[in-house]
Amino acid sequence: MPRKFRVLQIGGDDLEPIFQHKKGVSWDYFDIGLFEFDSGYVEAIEAIVEAEGRFDFIYIQAPYSETLTNLLQMISEPYNTYVDESFWSVEYEQDENVQKYVVQPLHYRNIEERNNKLEAVSFSGQYGDKVSPKLALVHPNFKGDVVYQGNSELTLSGEFGKEFKPIASWQNNLVYDKDKVIQIWPEFDIDGAVELQYTFRLIQTGADGALIEQIVLTDDMLDSPLEIPAKPFDAYISVTVKARGNGTVHLGPIHKRWSRLDMGQFLLGGSRFVDSQRQEFIYYFHPGDMKPPLNVYFSGYRTAEGFEGYYMMKRMNAPFLLIGDPRVEGGSFYIGSSEYEQGIINVIDETLEKLNFKSHELILSGLSMGSFGALYYGAQLNPQAIIVGKPLVNIGTIAEHMRLLRPEEFGTALDVLVSNEGDTSQASIQALNQKFWQTFQKKSLSQTVFAIAYMQHDDYDPHAFQELLPVLTAHQARVMNRSIPGRHNDDSPTIASWFVNFYNIILEDKFGRVQHAEKQNI
């Protein structure tokens, strides 16, 4: 049975009746009068938490008090607590616990909007997917040049006319999930004097397929994602694109996500960065115990969009930063424009600054595709340690090996090769490989510990560890490694176990953090 989304309301009129139709929501109400008349309220809430788990969302309709913030210290998690704007005050704003748990005011224009907002964000988990440009159908009346570039983009060049005319539609629809605000983010880029017009049609499921709603937006209206309000039924979303003018249009994937409105991307508190070419990465910061180090985890390849590694990193108790790459099919190795890559560096630097940490109080980590991000950006940030499993560094080679060594497997590498270098030639393969090595070899690595778990018979990047080791040796870096028999995807549990083990060793050795229960009891 799916886990319910647990909400605690503190003060105000009990809103549970509004949520009775949402079977996936469990609503608890706390009367603030208990602060004065029932000294056992702490034990009662502790019993609820122990029996049913922590609250996912806390909504406060009560004035600031020290008793209330002491309660929040017991039950709040970062980003999950909102105070009704009518009760928000300077006292809330300046309270240490409010700052620690990133408690924020809930803004709304009327009661209906408030209720809709609370309903919209009350769901467990996270979800996102996309439709690929390779599934787009070019309109037969378009007579210009057409180039499909895998899951990366569909390129249309030529004269589109003075009026908007259809150029492409997707043969696969997006799914509109009932009771969710659905966020839509189309990737596109334009060269020349071209304007685009996207049409999103909500179509009823079932035999009749009736049109429910039509949304038409030009490219300049899509600087922010489209958000379609929650509705009490499932539907499909069809997408068509029109263009006018003259030039080149690059149509990328169309992303669909469950929205948490202004409360976060995927998770409460999640964020996104987008460059001028509409290329994204997502990130989430958890303050942990606010003590060094900051642990950064780059997600691996994942077709379902969202954050990876939350519970693993949270168990370490230290501050952590999750970074994900939702582009192409399951990620694009965290490389892109200089603006995009600088964005990742800035997010890490700004998080260190927020914590008042130095670069030696930083650990970068990742598995498989995420290992590239950890090594590539780690070489530029001078961290205390870089921890990786199944390292992938030669993206060009990974793409090349799809032809004979790994047929029809992990075509994402080809998408990344073409989107970064323009083709699949040998020169482009080497150029993409060198993008990593030119950065990695020219940086000072002597103060960084490298912990690497790798597959002995890796069929993605067979010589990654053997090529990394001489560079690390030349820089006099400290290296810990573990080899596991098998190909790239043969033994993920053992790799993950060594990944966590390396973390435990470094956290204890460098930061005095004892992760093992038997040691903590000594």
UniProtKB/Swiss-Prot annotation:
Null mutant phenotype reads: No effect on cell growth, significantly reduces export of the cell wall protein SraP. The small amount that is exported seems to be glycosylated normally.
Q: Return the Pfam families for the record.
A: Asp2
**Which InterPro entries does the UniProt entry name for this protein?**
AB_hydrolase_fold, Asp2
One GO term of the biological process aspect: protein transport
| Keyword Protein transport among record annotations | yes
Q: Which UniProt keywords apply?
A: Protein transport, Translocation, Transport
Which family does this protein fall into? Belongs to the accessory Sec system protein Asp2 family.
- Purpose of the protein: Part of the accessory SecA2/SecY2 system specifically required to export SraP, a serine-rich repeat cell wall protein encoded upstream in the same operon.
Q: How does it assemble?
A: Part of the accessory SecA2/SecY2 protein translocation apparatus required to export cell wall protein SraP.
Name the record gives this protein: Accessory Sec system protein Asp2
